[in-house]
Amino acid sequence: MTTNVGSPAVGIAVKAEQNVLADRFKTAVKDCDVERKENLSGYRQKWVQWMSWYGYGAPEPNNIQDQIHRMLFNDLTYRATASVRSSVEAGMEISARSATLVYLLDQGYVVSQVLALQKLLDNGSDVISVKRLLKNVEKHRPFITREVYVAGDGLPYDFTSWADTVDKSDPMVQFYGIDAPGLRRFAMSKQLHETFDQLSGKKPDQRTRQDVIPKSIFRTLDSWISGPRFEEIKDLRDKVIAHAANALEVGKSTFNGVSFSQIDELQRAIVRVVHALIDEILSIRITRPVVPIAPLGIFRGLDLLYSPSDAEAKMHQRWDDLSEERNGWNAGVLQEVTFSPTSP
């Protein structure tokens, strides 16, 4: 995922490891080229809050970026691990096709994905979710005016004023114009204006400082993560978790109504809505991947024998021991529930 909204030469995006909050609002509100200072103050407060929900700024263990990373990490790890079931020739006996391992892996995968998707789409007002972020940004969209979007962190509002700040006889200026070295602030301003043109539906000759993003943009984003296909997630959550033993069709790409293509579609919609909000509407300006980098050696050891042949009997014995313990949990229930030394 990238936040570069224009020419790569301008470098409007920074690397993900850089602190997005460190320098973003280094310029005081009073020194910004913004007419409505109180509006900018309100925007900055909300922007910091929105970024903490997303995963930058104040620590939030359930932030949206971490939720998405966990969801995608689990998804890719499962699919890559399970792929050997079909990639290895059918005649070769491998533990990857063991009915028990297949059942446990498949069940864990489906449950983790359904829960992750449902959590990101939770519409509650007390959770950190994509739905809540979308609703909150829309609610406060009057803060996001063109002048705040372009000049709210110290950039010039009028990018055409660059010509008054340079030596026009400079060969670099004559060749590159606004993209010449030393004019980065003006080039960024120009790009942000162009992006806001798209968001606001305005042409360059219609620009005003108080342009805002229309509600239709937010309605479109909401439609991407709403409707019957997303309502099904709630039903799937209940069905898969409450009746997990019957939810799996071993070795198939469908789990009683949950398909890989369906999961792909829901994941993609969530990722794209988050990109629209964080990268375009809130202009985070950070380049980062959608999927976290895989740890070194993530699949190391999967080529080893799962257990020696004589371990099967020990597994059966362990099952029997655990069963005996749990079957004894009902013993003495009546005596314990009816005995209370503190009863009158």
Please name every model-derived segment.
Residues T2-P228, F255-P344:
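Amphipathic alpha-helical interface segments
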Residues S223-V250:
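Histidine-centered, metal-coordinating catalytic motifs and their short helical/loop contexts
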